Amino acid sequence: VVLDLGNGTFGALQRYLDPFALDGVILSHLHPDHCADFSALTVYRRYHPHPPPGGMMPVYGPPDAAERLIAAYAPNAEERNRTNLSDLYTFRPYGGVTARIGALGILAAPVEHSCEAYAVRISHAGRALVYSGDTGPCPQLVKLATGADLLLAEASWPDRPDNPAGIHLSGKDAGKAA
């Protein structure tokens, strides 16, 4: 799986993994720095001369992910009328229950950011990784991270009392959440 597809991540991904080997996409939120390369993945999957057989790819994200990602891929009405991406993806909004991508359990919790955003807990064989996505300090992240083996947390703010609330973590905030 891939956790977010911000600008430049698709090119980097291809250095290490065939994009057709992906079993799913998990999007924390829909700001471009977390999903801009979804369009690159879509072009690759749609127009590759030798795609593997089968395979709708699940995309987990906020409820409006399908609409927003279709608009990013097909920016005008004529093009949107020709595709809704349902030939490539099954869009699945987070629903507060554990979902599955293969053997992985996926559980998301809403967190505090400037738009609808989620932290995600990925579990397998009794181990768990929690990805914060963009968030300010919040009890939902702490609850989701409790007992996890690893917290992958963004920490964009310096540790200052005048940071805008509910947008990003500082390194100190990330440490407290862990």
Predicted segment positions?
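P-loop/Walker A phosphate-binding loop and immediately adjacent motor/lid segment at beta-alpha junctions
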Residues: 41-58, 123, 163-178
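Generic structural signal for conserved hydrophobic packing positions in ordered secondary structure
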Residues: 13, 38-41, 69, 120, ...
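Histidine-centered active-site/metal-ligand motif
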Residues: 29-34, 113, 168-171
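Core dinuclear metal-dependent hydrolase active-site scaffold
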Residues: 1-18, 90-143
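Active-site neighborhood of phospho(di)ester-bond hydrolases with catalytic His/Asp-centered motifs
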Residues: 2-6, 23-29, 33, 62, ...
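Cap/insert and terminal regions of metallo-dependent hydrolase folds
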Residues: 136-178
